[in-house]
């Protein structure tokens, strides 16, 4: 949603005459198999404020859209043969990466920055399943890759896997069998990764259908998985007394994990009135309460402090 409860919608199209009314960066089809698209419409869904295509000469698709508190727009998608097309004003990038994140201006008239990530082989590595921009503008991605599953859909068996994706030191799981989930946090200016890890079983074809996972605003992902296919039980479970630590199916079984990426959040916003020689200066706390256990600390600079909400 936009600042005024307006709506952003994204997707993909193979139509060379897909309508893109209003303001927007790209007004013509980029060529190739598909282009991504993004629409900004009013809250009643009867006026298009702006719209843009997002694509070049191969396969391009937008999966998710998020906005921040300034109304800036972030999209996550896949791209084949991306080369350096999606790299602009971003220190962290992978030329020819199979996934891209773009930060648009509010009116979709241009990019603030854009980057591609992945192995850099010119094909998509993961299917995105969840996307978040948190209150501090950190960018969260969840997705899965599996050559074995994608081969069943007719793709070559040597593409669309998780091997070779960047992970960070001390991450939860640093190795992959190429058929796992991938969790990532990117810095708000695309200068680097704050955290990245694999999660999945070894020698298992872990995957999921779309629309089955979410991040909350604190960066916790709730992810459903088609796990432990082949009647194994190697997908990690926790704690030991969880509902079902083993796979009780004779093939795949549904698994749900809640993973806290544990990035510290300092959330603050203030309203300070203008004045001169005020005897009393009221402070109004406009911080967004993301948890009932949130703590507040005021330091007035004169030795006085407060924990009032």
Where are these regions (language model features)?
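Short beta-strand segments within Ig-like beta-sandwich modules, predominantly Fibronectin type-III
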Residues: 303-309
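A sequence-level/structural motif corresponding to short, flexible coil/turn segments enriched
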Residues: 1-277, 284-299, 303
């Amino acid at each position: 949603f936009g600042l005024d409860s307006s709506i952003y919608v994204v997707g993909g199209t193979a139509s060379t005459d897909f309508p893109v009314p209003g303001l927007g960066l790209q007004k013509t089809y980029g060529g190739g198999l598909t282009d991504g698209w993004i629409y900004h419409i009013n809250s009643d869904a009867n006026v298009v404020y702006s719209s843009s295509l997002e694509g070049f000469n191969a396969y391009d698709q937008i999966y998710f859209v998020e906005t921040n508190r300034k109304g800036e727009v972030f999209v996550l998608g896949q791209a084949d043969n991306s080369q350096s097309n999606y790299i602009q004003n971003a220190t962290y990038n992978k030329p020819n990466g199979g996934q891209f994140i773009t930060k648009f201006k509010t009116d979709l008239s241009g990019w603030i920055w854009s980057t591609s990530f992945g192995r850099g082989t010119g094909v998509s590595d993961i299917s995105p399943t969840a996307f978040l921009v948190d209150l501090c503008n950190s960018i969260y991605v969840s997705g899965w890759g599996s050559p074995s599953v994608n081969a069943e859909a007719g793709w070559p068996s040597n593409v669309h896997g998780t091997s070779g994706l960047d992970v960070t030191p001390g991450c939860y799981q640093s190795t992959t069998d190429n058929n796992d989930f991938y969790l990532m946090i990117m810095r708000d200016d695309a200068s680097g990764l704050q955290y990245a890890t694999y999660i999945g079983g070894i020698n298992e074809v872990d995957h999921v259908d779309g629309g089955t996972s979410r991040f909350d605003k604190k960066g916790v992902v709730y992810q459903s998985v088609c796990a432990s296919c082949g009647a194994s039980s190697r997908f990690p479970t926790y704690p030991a007394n969880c509902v079902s630590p083993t796979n009780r199916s004779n093939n795949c079984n549904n698994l749900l994990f809640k993973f806290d990426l544990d990035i510290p959040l300092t959330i603050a916003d203030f309203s300070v009135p203008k004045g001169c020689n005020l005897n009393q200066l009221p402070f109004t706390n406009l911080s967004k309460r993301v948890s009932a256990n949130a703590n507040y600390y005021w330091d007035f600079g004169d030795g006085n402090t407060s924990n009032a909400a």
